[in-house]
A protein has these predicted regions:
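Short, conserved SAM-binding/catalytic segment
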Residues: 195, 214-225
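Core catalytic lobe of class I
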Residues: 1-212
Length: 225
């Protein structure tokens, strides 16, 4: 909403309140000026490491292309980074298994451990049958918020897709856990947290966005700060 903010202060406070085993999902893209990307996404990821957090994964949100983002010599931009920072080993990692296996129903020998989980294999001795669904990769094809179902849309100018928030919450937390969004915006994270049975705290300085969020979530259950 045009408000300035202090990344380093936000990062420090996120690390301060994060419990051991907790996870930060940091979604960011670079701005382009005078034909050069800012590189701030990588600087921010490395700063989380300097704060003593682990950089568990560098994920990609793959979305429809939206022009060259200020640089007509570059390829169209169709991705944002999703950095996963943790305080120690993550307490929860409910990795989603909804990737369709092209080789579903066939069998393979010698698949074990992580590979078996990746392919959704069922152990039948030395031969394992490949399941219909395997683990997602760290590249998520989720589209844009404008392509979501009508009930998941909002009047915010740049909301994240509902299923992006939902799927990260489902992966890194369990029912009853507390989810914090320091840039709550129109309440997408809050709605996803409520849908999945998580507690939620949202911080937002723009009263217009708070009003939008209040229309999307039940205030008797979730309180926006």
């Amino acid at each position: 909403g045009g408000h300035s903010w202090d990344f380093f202060g936000v990062a420090w406070h996120l690390k301060r309140v994060l419990k051991p085993g907790g996870v930060i999902v940091w979604v960011v893209a670079d701005a382009t000026k005078d034909g050069s990307e800012s590189g701030s996404s990588f600087e921010q990821a490395l700063h989380f490491k300097r704060l003593g957090l682990n950089l568990l994964d560098t994920m990609i949100w793959n979305k429809p292309p939206a022009g060259a983002n200020g640089n007509n010599d570059a390829y169209s931009q169709s991705a944002e980074y999703m950095f996963i920072a943790t305080k120690g080993k993550p307490k929860t990692s409910n990795r989603l298994a909804d990737r369709v296996n092209k080789s579903a129903g066939t069998s393979r020998a010698g698949t074990s451990g992580g590979r078996a989980e990746k392919y959704g294999s069922k152990d039948t001795g030395r031969i394992q049958q490949i399941g219909d669904l395997g683990l997602r990769t760290n590249v998520w094809d989720l589209g844009l918020a404008s392509q979501q179902k009508a009930e998941d849309k909002s009047d915010h100018p740049a909301p994240f897709p509902f299923n992006l928030a939902r799927d990260h919450i489902a992966t890194w937390s369990n029912p009853g856990d507390l989810v914090l969004d320091p840039f709550s915006g129109s309440g997408t994270t809050a709605k996803a947290a409520k849908t999945l049975g998580r507690q939620f705290i949202g911080l937002e300085v723009n009263p217009d966005y708070c009003a939008i969020a209040e229309q999307r979530i039940a205030q008797e259950v979730l309180e926006l700060v």
